[in-house]
Amino acid sequence: MLFFVLLHIEGVSAKLRKLPYLIFNRIYMAIKDKIKKLADKYTKTLHSQIAQRKKEMKDDTSHYLIYRVLGISNEEGQLIDEYQNTGRFLYKYAGSFLEEATTLCFTEVYPEGCKTKIPNTLGQKPKTFEIDFLNGTDAIEIKWRDATTDGDHITKEHTRVKVITGAGFTPIRVMFYYPQRAQAIKIQETLETLYSGVNGEYYAGDYAWEFVKRYTGIDLKQVLEEIAYERTASNND
C-alpha cells in the first residue's frame, strides 16, 4: 500500500502541499479505485473484441493460399493473423486506457479542469483544436505514444500550438512512451523544439511520469505497477 507525504514529493505544486495528509491519501485511494474499475472496463472490452475478431477470422481463410505460396503453413498463417489482430486491439485499448487513467489523476486533484475545445483562429481546418485537460492556463495534451511518421503532423501541431498560445494558454505535451522508428523519433524531436520555442513544455518517457507525479502528487506509474502486480499474483494463484 502506498501512502504519500506531500512535503516529500520534490517539485509538487504549492496547492497540493497545503492539502492535509489524510485528505490527500483519501484522494489517492479514490483514484486508485477508479483506475482499477477503468482497467476492468477496458479488459472486458478488449477480450470481447479479440474473441469476436478470432471468430470472424475463422470464417475467412481463403487468403491462406497466398501465405502457402510464400512458404507459410496454414497453422502459421492462423497464428500470425491472430497475433496481428490481437496486437492492433491491444495497442488501441492500452493507449486509450493510459490516457484516460492520466486524465483521472488530473481531474481528481483539479476538478475545475476539463477537456476543452478552442476555435482554430489561424485556419478553417480543423475548425477547433481539442485540449485534453485545461487547468487554468495549462493546456495539457496526453499521449501514451505518438508513432506518426507523417510530416503533415508537424504542420498541424505547429498550428495547434500557436492557437493555444494565442489564446493565452501554455501548451504542455505529455507522452509516456517514445516511438521506436527513426522517422517517428525525428518528428518528436521537432515537436520538442516547437514547444520550447513558444515557452511550452514537452515531457516524454520517464519525464512524462515525473510530470504527472509532480503536477498531481500521484505516482501514476507506481499505481499501475501495484494494480499489475495484484492481477498477476491473482492469475498465478
Model regions and ranges:
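Short, Lys/Arg-enriched N-terminal segments with co-localized hydrophobic residues
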Residues: 4-28
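Interdomain/boundary linker segments immediately adjacent to catalytic/signaling cores
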Residues: 22-110
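Conserved catalytic cores of phosphodiester-cleaving nucleases, focusing on short active-site segments
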Residues: 106, 131-144
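Active-site metal-binding core of divalent-cation-utilizing nuclease and nuclease-like domains
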Residues: 115-134
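Catalytic cores of nucleic-acid endonucleases
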Residues: 144-197
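Domain-level recognition of nuclease-like catalytic cores that cleave nucleotide substrates
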Residues: 176-237
